[in-house]
Amino acid sequence: GRELFFISRWPSPDLRQGRLSVREATVKLKGAEIICECLLAEGVEVIFGHPGGAVLPLYDALYKYSQLRHILVRHEQCAAHAADGYARASRQVGVCLATSGPGATNLVTGIACAMMDSVPIVAITGNVPTTAIGRDAFQETDITGITMPITKHNYLVTRVEDLARVLKEAFHIARTGRPGPVLVDIPKDIFLKETWFEYPETVNLPGYKPTLHGNARQIRAAAELIAQAQRPVILAGHGVLISGAEAELREFAEKTDIPVICTLLGLGAFPESHELSLAMPGMHGAAYSNLAIHESDLIIAIGMRFDDRITGKVEAFAPKAKVIHIDIDPAEIGKNVKATVPIVGDAKLVLRELIKAVQPGNHRDWLAQIWEWRRKMPLTVIRETDKLLPQYVIRKLYEITGGDAIVVTDVGQHQMWAAQHWWYDKPNSFISS
């Protein structure tokens, strides 16, 4: 039952292989080494970055940690986008690294993208030494101030003793609740200072307690609205995929016999080959899906924010419909469309509670009407021509692969074609922004 404490100035072979455990050893390490140990403790395998003077001590430490694979990018913006894409594809926290000043500011677009799409990344930036902060030193920027509106949280670490706690909190904040980017800014001298290292097993954030389970009274109220509805639709967003609630969404839709419309980032949350699946809504979506929303008397919105590309003029959006809005972020509920029954909670857990609360439904008449609209107003018709149309190419790629592929797009018209002409039956098979 006696604890073993190992004291060393440099990482042992066991540390380099990532086998140090807070239960096994407490050691004295430099700040840069502490960062590497924290990354290993969080299960990080890949880092995207670009070196610079303020982060050279961290690069020196990375050389000794072979389990951390560093991917060199040409520009720091690429590092942020790569971390974003890695997080979307792997469902792990993406990590990017940049130096001070222009290196840090080059991350901004990628961080903002991750913030908008609720993608968990941890951005680590170097800064000028602590004694030079606020003195307009060479390549000094207030990156914490700059990124305050586009991060879920950010830190400026001024004591090496705080590094382990800050990184533990950063990863916890990035991946829990509504995921998002967290930036950790570290002055150069903090990388070089030494302290005793012990990675905390828990976090202590009294002001940060995401609500996971829906309020029981609101669940009952939602079940009552669902029982009364004659023309309901489900709007499933990115939050369903983030929560891993695809199975619950399918069970809920099949039990209630309610059609499902997935948003752009929600594609794959519900199989498009399913009879209850309708095409993407909004200005680039299907007319019959938009008509179903417009004529509905109940919208069950799950993990989506009622983006302007879906609603158009908010005052005219679904004028006959009551709204059940389920989201883990309370700030989203009522922000764009007023909710009749707001439910704050994790999509997976709330859907489980709703499945128990609702009775089996039958909406065949309503579905027949929607299917008739779909027959008259299909999403698109690819006409035969002697020219090669991009829509035709995308559809042929889908047929050749049988849909068993991950589709990654930039933003633009090709993105819309990829959303329209590929059927996404599996979660996380469409990566876009």
Whereabouts are the PLM-identified features?
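Structural signature of the thiamine diphosphate
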Residues: 45-46, 88-99, 104-125, 148-201, ...
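Short Gly/Ser/Thr- and charged-rich N-terminal loops/segments
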Residues: 14-21
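Active-site diphosphate/adenylate-binding microenvironment
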Residues: 32-35, 40-44, 50-53, 58-62, ...
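Aromatic-enriched
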Residues: 22-23, 188-217, 221, 364-366, ...
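Glycine-rich, anion-gripping cofactor-binding loops and their flanking helix/strand elements
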Residues: 88, 238-324, 420-433
